[in-house]
């Protein structure tokens, strides 16, 4: 009779024996995996070495304006302009909000210079500035995530992205809200003090709106329940974060992290919110015209969204307490064809520049005609996914030429025109003299190949 083998599981993280490299057995059927042992060692080492050395390091870091680069609003907007086309209203709003947030942190860390203190009125020195989280409203592909990530890079602070649709209320299948904070802690390489000055971007926040206004016996664990769970984290609380993530359980080791100084940026498309605003505004005068007199199709969605009030978001499904913790609202415009053309070629890491670099590695120049760029932008508008559509369109256009190019030894320049974008033609290749060096191979390797061919 075959001997049955019983699968063992880690008593800490719950992983099976075949999912880890080593499982260590303890008394009374308790087991621990090598990954959890490593985490425990890290926690113990941090606590043991966190006395004198840790205090010295933290005080040294505290002298550097609170461990982040504090830029003026104009500088922040100028940096954002390098990466994000258009969206001036949103960039100005973000620049002011971020500047005030990190100035608040610097004040809280008591690292202001003597010049700053001398300018400050004595009546305000004991005033505590409250945190202002940010809500981004805008269509998909308009640059919400890019704005948030660019802010984190320029400020040199940890940054994490979370998807609100994966979150559920504690005790139900799905991710706990503490896992959002865990991602930030991981981005900070488990440096708690650094993580406490970071930025968290919560995407698809509109998807956790209350499903219905009707009272139901069924609990809304992924909608209103998640909003309730996020309240304390947004406002500021000390979270007990499990180092390995997952669900909490008794006797588990936690890392404590204060969210009071973490900047939360929540973003969502909020589809049809403009209709709610339209119904509320009615005949309210805007300039020399009224929304009542103009057909809805003639009013830009972004213009309506700028009139958004908390009551509109409540009607959309967000609870009042949640909205109150996102006082700063920035609206992003839907990208036009000219915006998409600028994104293709004029941003710091534009797709045209990225593909140009790939081609230059092969010793070949890449050129897009103006009508080709216009055609790509038109196709992106048809797909209705904003700037996200640009890469998929470019990948399709460039697939064949990038497949054949490495085998060509005489190609000097590749020209992409509208016919290529529309699928009615092939890229034009200008040939020259045979290249002496093949990209990707060293001169020694090529010399060896040549000698073998001669032999």
Name these PLM-found stretches.
Residues 2-25, 49-160, 165-173, 178-455:
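AAA+ P-loop NTPase nucleotide-binding core of proteostasis motors
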Residues 14, 34-37, 41:
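Cys/His-coordinated zinc-binding microdomains
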Residues 9, 29-32:
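The −1 position to Zn-ligating cysteines in a subset of zinc-ribbon hairpins
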Residues 8, 38-41, 45:
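Membrane-proximal soluble domains of inner-membrane proteins
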């Amino acid at each position: 009779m075959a001997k049955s083998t019983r699968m063992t599981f880690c008593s800490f993280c719950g992983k099976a024996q075949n999912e880890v490299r080593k499982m260590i057995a303890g008394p009374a059927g308790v087991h621990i995996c090598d990954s959890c042992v490593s985490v425990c060692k890290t926690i113990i080492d941090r606590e043991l070495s966190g006395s004198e050395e840790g205090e010295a390091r933290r005080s040294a870091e505290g002298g550097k304006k609170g461990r982040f680069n504090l830029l003026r609003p104009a500088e922040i907007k100028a940096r954002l302009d390098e990466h994000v086309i258009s969206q001036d209203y949103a960039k100005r709003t973000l620049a002011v909000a971020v500047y005030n947030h990190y100035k608040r942190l610097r004040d809280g860390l008591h690292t202001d210079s003597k010049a700053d203190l001398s300018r400050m009125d004595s009546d305000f020195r004991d005033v505590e500035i409250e945190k202002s989280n940010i809500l981004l409203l805008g269509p998909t592909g308009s640059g919400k995530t890019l704005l948030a990530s660019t802010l984190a890079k320029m400020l040199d602070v940890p940054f994490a992205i979370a998807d609100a649709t994966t979150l559920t209320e504690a005790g139900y299948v799905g991710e706990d809200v503490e896992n959002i904070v865990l991602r930030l802690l991981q981005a900070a390489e488990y440096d708690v003090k650094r993580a406490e000055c970071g930025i968290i971007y919560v995407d698809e926040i509109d998807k956790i709106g209350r499903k219905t206004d009707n009272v139901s016996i069924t609990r809304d664990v992924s909608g209103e329940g998640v909003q309730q769970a996020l309240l304390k984290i947004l406002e500021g609380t000390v979270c007990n974060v499990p180092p390995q993530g997952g669900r909490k359980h008794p006797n588990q080791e936690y890392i404590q992290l204060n969210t009071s100084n973490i900047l939360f940026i929540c973003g969502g498309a909020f589809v049809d919110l403009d209709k709610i605003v339209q119904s509320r505004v009615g005949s309210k005068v805007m300039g020399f015209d009224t929304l009542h007199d103009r057909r809805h199709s003639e009013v830009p969605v972004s213009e309506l969204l700028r009139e958004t009030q908390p009551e509109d978001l409540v009607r959309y499904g967000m609870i009042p307490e949640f909205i109150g913790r996102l006082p700063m609202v920035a609206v992003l415009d839907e990208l036009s064809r000219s915006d998409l053309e600028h994104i293709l070629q004029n941003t710091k890491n534009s797709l045209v520049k990225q593909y140009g670099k790939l081609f230059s590695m092969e010793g070949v120049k890449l050129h897009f005609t103006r009508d080709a760029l216009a055609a790509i932008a038109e196709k992106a508008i048809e797909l209705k996914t904003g700037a996200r559509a640009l890469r998929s369109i470019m990948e399709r256009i460039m697939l064949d030429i990038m497949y054949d190019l490495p085998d060509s030894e005489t190609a000097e320049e590749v020209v992409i025109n509208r016919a290529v974008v529309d699928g009615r033609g092939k890229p034009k290749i200008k040939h020259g003299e045979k290249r002496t060096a093949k990209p990707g191979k060293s001169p020694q390797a090529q010399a060896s190949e040549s000698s073998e061919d001669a032999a």
